[in-house]
Amino acid sequence: MNSIVNFSQQLIQNFQEVSQKTAADSSNLKAFAYLGAGLAMIGVIGVGAGQGYAAGKACDAIARNPEAQKQVFRVLVIGTAISETSSIYALLVALILIFVG
């Protein structure tokens, strides 16, 4: 009977030590999740610069040839939608890291 009591006390002590370590580790994990979310959003900078460059070139093309406005606009919208997907994925990863991680 005494061995069972000692075992249960040792088990409770081990559980308390593990829970204290887990509490300290979870704060570090949250900090790394925020850091990862920030790093994931760095990828959006390139997307914004690329879309701005493409829009500028589309304006130049329309200024040179106004009759091709519909074709240039269609290509611009498709290109913008394709390039925007990477920033949406970066935002999704950041939100998952912040709220789930």
UniProtKB/Swiss-Prot annotation:
Pfam families: ATP-synt_C. Its main location: membrane. HAMAP family: ATP_synth_c_bact. It is found in: Cell membrane. The gene is atpE. The chain crosses the membrane at residues 31-51, 81-101. It comes from Mesomycoplasma hyopneumoniae (strain 232). The record marks E84 as: Reversibly protonated during proton transport. The lineage of its organism: Bacteria, Bacillati, Mycoplasmatota, Mycoplasmoidales, Metamycoplasmataceae. This is ATP synthase subunit c. F(1)F(0) ATP synthase produces ATP from ADP in the presence of a proton or sodium gradient. F-type ATPases consist of two structural domains, F(1) containing the extramembraneous catalytic core and F(0) containing the membrane proton channel, linked together by a central stalk and a peripheral stalk. During catalysis, ATP synthesis in the catalytic domain of F(1) is coupled via a rotary mechanism of the central stalk subunits to proton translocation.
